[in-house]
A protein has these predicted regions:
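N-terminal, Lys/Arg-enriched amphipathic/low-complexity engagement segments
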Residues: 57-111
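Short, Lys/Arg- and Gly-enriched loop/turn segments at beta-strand edges
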Residues: 95-106, 141-151, 251-261, 350-352
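N-terminal secretory signal peptides and thylakoid transit peptides that target proteins
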Residues: 1-14
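Conserved mixed alpha/beta catalytic, RNA-binding, or beta-rich assembly cores of soluble enzyme
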Residues: 207, 214-231, 235, 241-311
C-alpha cells in the first residue's frame, strides 16, 4: 500500500492537515540574506500583473539539501528570509522525493512514509502580514534531470475506489513509467510495459505545488490544495505567469515544489510526468490587498483556482471569484458580470485525485467590456 493510499485512508477531508506543527529544532531557520543591494524593491500597492523583473533586483541563490525539503504547508520554520522584490534562483524535487528512478521502482517500496511532494522553502517574506498578497512571478522552470517518472498507486486515481469514493471491482496494480527527456526537442518519451508501443509528450514544466502557510495556524500536508494554494497541480503555474497568494501568517511562508514536466487535464491516474526543476522566481509583496483564493495572471488572461469536493463546489469557488473580479474591473452590475462570465469563461478540470478536487476558471482579459458614454 502506497504512502498516498495510506494518507487518503488516514483522515476525512475536514480533518486533513490537522497535524502537529514541526518544532524549531526540527526545521532550523537559515540565515538566508539575499545577495546584491541591501534595499529591495518596495512593496507594491496594487495587484497589477508583473511583466518584467528589474535588472537590479537582489538575488538569493540557494540549492537546498534533501534534509532542507519540507512536506507540509505551515508548521515548518522558514529556511530563508527574503525582502520583497527578490529574485530566487533555486531547485526543487519531484513528487516522489527523488526516490523513483526506473520503471522497476515502485513508490510504495522506495519512498519514506509522508514524503510525498517535497517543497523548497518556506521563504519568509519580510513585511508580509495577514491581509496582504504575495505575487510570485515565475521567470524560469527547466528540467533538472534527463528523465522523469509517472506512476499509478493503488487507491489513488480518478477511476478507482478509495475511502471517499466506493467502487466495486479490483484495483489496478502499482505501476511506474520512466520518461526520457530530449532537451533538444523539448519532449519526453516513454514506452508501454511490453515495449511494443512508444509515445512522446511536449515538455511544459510547472509547479504541482505552490502555496503559503494556511490560516489559523493550520498545518496541511502537501497532498492537499486549498485557498492557501498547495497541491493544485495546475499547468498554468508555469514560466511567464504570476501567481497571487493571500497571506495568512507573518512572513507568508512561501513554498513550492512537485515539479511536473507535462500533465493532461484531470491528472486522472494520480501523477503527472514528474521531475525535478531548476527554478527562478521573482517575489513581490502587495500590502493591504487580500487574495481569498489563488489567482494567476499573464498579459492576456486572468485565472482563478478553486479547490473543493464535490467537483462542482471547486468550480463554484473559482467562478464566484471570477465574477467578483470582472465586476470590480468593469463596474458592471453583478448580474451583468455573471452573464459575461457565463458566456466567456473556460473551466478545465485540473485534477480529480486529491482530497480536494481543483478547477481552473480562465478568461481573456481583453474581452472585458468598458463603459461607453
Amino acid at each position: 500500500m502506497t504512502t498516498r493510499r495510506k494518507f487518503l485512508l488516514s483522515a476525512p477531508i475536514g480533518a486533513i492537515g490537522a497535524v502537529a506543527a514541526c518544532s524549531g529544532s526540527d526545521h532550523a531557520a537559515a540565515a538566508g540574506t539575499p545577495a546584491g543591494s541591501a534595499d529591495a524593491v518596495a512593496p507594491r500597492s496594487s495587484p497589477t500583473p508583473i511583466t518584467s523583473v528589474p535588472a537590479d533586483a537582489p538575488v538569493l541563490s540557494w540549492t537546498p539539501k534533501h534534509e532542507d525539503l519540507v512536506y507540509t504547508f505551515g508548521g515548518a520554520a522558514p529556511k530563508q528570509r527574503i525582502k520583497p522584490g527578490t529574485r530566487i534562483v533555486t531547485w526543487t524535487e519531484d513528487c516522489f522525493d527523488g526516490a523513483v528512478k526506473t520503471a522497476a521502482d515502485l513508490p510504495s517500496k522506495k519512498m519514506p512514509p509522508g514524503h510525498d511532494n517535497p517543497q523548497t522553502g518556506p521563504f519568509y517574506v519580510e513585511g508580509a502580514e495577514p491581509g496582504d498578497t504575495v505575487a510570485v512571478h515565475i521567470v524560469k522552470l527547466e528540467p533538472a534531470r534527463s528523465y522523469a517518472v509517472s506512476a499509478f498507486s493503488p487507491g489513488f486515481g480518478a477511476l478507482v475506489g478509495n475511502d471517499q469514493t466506493a467502487m466495486l471491482g479490483p484495483d489496478f496494480p502499482e505501476t511506474t513509467w520512466r520518461y526520457e527527456v530530449d532537451a533538444a526537442r523539448n519532449v519526453a518519451r516513454a514506452s508501454s510495459a511490453d515495449g511494443k508501443h512508444k509515445w512522446e509528450l511536449p515538455i511544459s514544466p510547472f509547479f504541482g505545488c505552490i502555496g503559503v502557510a494556511p490560516a489559523g495556524g493550520e498545518v496541511r500536508t502537501t497532498i492537499v490544495p486549498g485557498n492557501f494554494g498547495g497541491n493544485m497541480d495546475c499547468p498554468e503555474v508555469r514560466a511567464g505567469n504570476t501567481v497571487y497568494l493571500g497571506v495568512n501568517a507573518p512572513g507568508a511562508l512561501l513554498s513550492f515544489g512537485d515539479g511536473h514536466y507535462a500533465m493532461g487535464d484531470g491528472e486522472i491516474m494520480g501523477a503527472a510526468v514528474e521531475g525535478a526543476l531548476n527554478v527562478e522566481v521573482y517575489v513581490e509583496l502587495i500590502k493591504n490587498v487580500a487574495t481569498p483564493i489563488p489567482r494567476i495572471e499573464n498579459a492576456g488572461e486572468i485565472m482563478f483556482v478553486g479547490s473543493g469536493r464535490p467537483l462542482e463546489d471547486a468550480a463554484r469557488v473559482a467562478f464566484k471569484a471570477m465574477i467578483e473580479w470582472v465586476r470590480a474591473k468593469s463596474h458592471m452590475s453583478e448580474m451583468d458580470s455573471y452573464q459575461f462570465v457565463s458566456q466567456n469563461a473556460k473551466a478545465p478540470i485540473i485534477q480529480l485525485v486529491d482530497p480536494q478536487y481543483t478547477v481552473l476558471v480562465k478568461l481573456d482579459k481583453h474581452r472585458i467590456p468598458t463603459a461607453t458614454q
